[in-house]
Amino acid sequence: MTAPANGPLRIAMISYYLPSGSKIGVGYQVHELATELVRRGHHVDVFSDCPPVDGAIYGHRHIASSGSLRTFRFALALRRVDFGSYDVLHAHGDDYWLWRRRVARHIRTVHGSCFEEALRIPGLREKLRMTLLGFSELLASVVADETVVVSPVTRRWMPWVKRIIPNGVDSLRFHPDATQRANDPTILFVGTWENRKRGKDLAAAFERDVVPLVERARLEMVCRDAPDTPGPGIHILGNLNDAELSAAYQRAWAFCLPSDYEGFGIPYAEAMSSGVPVVSTPNVGARYVTDNGAAGLLTPLGKIGTSLTQLLLDPLERERLREAGLKRAALFDLRTVVDSYELLYRAND
């Protein structure tokens, strides 16, 4: 089946996560996509376990789940929803039970691989949960009319999926402004102190390698789980709104997110769109977003502090990476991404 060839569409989006209840990047991407689609005249309702996002211009349908294994309960609850009034069902997770819950077009976006996360996440119980979610992703790719991955590497786990549409960044919000750059050499981190984002490891590398060699160096960390005294020169910014986050990027001399795993890595694209050189460990998302290091600096975790020090002291290299990053970031412009989805919504099977 196909959605109407012309006119506004009625779109149901599924996302367990939204910015109102989670820091998971998928929720932020869904919020951005839904907002842009509404601006283009479409009707969008997001079905989520999270509460509505303050100020959101799209509709919200709360699918409550509780107890253990909440994501699995959420997926089962979706099977009781009648999506028949929509032209498009666009799922960003948890649609693997939705066979025969027909709409004109059922699209699934896979934002990364839970199998990849299962290889890295600590704890046997979490490894098992991620493995089960990985199998649910495989099932969902069969249930949907068409499945999309956000980076080529994700196809490792589902090679039958051919279409790639990257995540999108709002270039009207994340853009360069040289007048806002900090006077002091400033590194920005967006993530979590613990686990795979490895903020704690970045802070240790900053204190060990950067502070002794770069005068007045600062590390600004957008995270909520850092200790009260993270170390000299380290400033915890907590949770920022959109305008504050954009300003933080514009202040930065360099951006660093040394994750063990990213399915895509939206903060890399936000930094590049803001004209900020990117430094990262060579996780699969960073390799894709930076074009295998052509538009960013990829280095092992043990050398991350040394690489940041060299970059802060080398204005020519910062300018080279800034220009390369801006050029690469055009691929991830939100409007280009939504153009691709609009075509997919109306495509023939």
Residue ranges and their predicted role:
Residues 178-197, 203-207, 220:
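Conserved donor-binding/catalytic core segment of Leloir-type glycosyltransferases
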Residues 88-90, 100-120, 148:
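Active-site proximal beta-strand in glycosyltransferases
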